[in-house]
């Protein structure tokens, strides 16, 4: 449905903190960024992964080689929640892939992955040896890295030195559903699917900020969500 003009694409480098350099081709937003480089092994579900708040501050590397072939779904909301994404925007810093399919086909697709990245101002590189990159990350653990475009040098950035939970948590109290039971959900970077699952169990969900004092709440349960950053923090 959409075919990218491959001749006009810019080159960029992925530079790891140990000095390793991978060169790739840009298919997203053209801006130098830095963060923590991590890999994930799912074969499908890149719209969900990119919008997962747990990946805030991270440069995401799917191990599956071809990405983009089913495009990006159009947004639709139910009970105040996006049906096909895990939040209202992309949270990862950038996307690194092996092969990019600019042609896409799916009954619910609205745009290409590259178009979506550009709309959200998120860089993406393809043509990277993600197998070699994943092996390095598997051996050394998550590493700091940066995507560098010509003339846009930047420093490495460690997201774990900031309170990134505060950056992804809801700033306001929100309520979902009208179930029999009431659960206070402390939002440390919750995925929408967690809220969807609670709603299916006849639960009214009260979503509160990460630093909310819930000690005086009259409820049937407290749910502490997962989120980005080092769990030890």
Show where each model-derived region lies:
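Short amphipathic alpha-helix with an adjacent loop that forms part of the alpha/beta core around
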Residues: 212-218
């Amino acid at each position: 449905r959409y075919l990218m003009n491959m001749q006009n694409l810019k080159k960029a480098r992925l530079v790891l903190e140990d000095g390793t350099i991978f060169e790739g081709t840009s298919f997203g937003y053209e801006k130098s960024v830095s963060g923590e480089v991590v890999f994930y092994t799912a074969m499908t579900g890149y719209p969900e992964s990119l919008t997962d708040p747990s990946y805030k501050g991270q440069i995401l590397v799917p191990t599956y080689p071809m990405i983009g072939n089913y495009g990006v779904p159009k947004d639709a909301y139910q009970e105040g929640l996006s049906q096909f994404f895990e939040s209202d925007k992309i949270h990862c810093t950038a996307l690194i892939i092996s092969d990019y399919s600019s042609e896409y086909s799916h009954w619910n697709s609205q745009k290409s992955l590259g178009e979506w990245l550009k709309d959200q101002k998120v860089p993406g590189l393809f043509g990277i040896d993600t197998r070699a990159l994943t092996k390095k990350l598997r051996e050394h653990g998550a590493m700091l890295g940066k995507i560098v475009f010509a003339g846009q040098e930047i420093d490495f950035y460690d997201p774990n030195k900031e309170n990134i939970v505060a950056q992804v948590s809801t700033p306001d109290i929100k309520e979902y559903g009208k179930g029999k039971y009431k659960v206070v959900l402390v939002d440390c970077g919750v995925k929408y699917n967690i809220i969807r699952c609670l709603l299916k169990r006849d639960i009214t969900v009260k979503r509160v900020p990460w630093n909310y004092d819930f000690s005086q709440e009259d409820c049937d349960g407290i749910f502490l969500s997962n989120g980005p950053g080092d769990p030890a923090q």
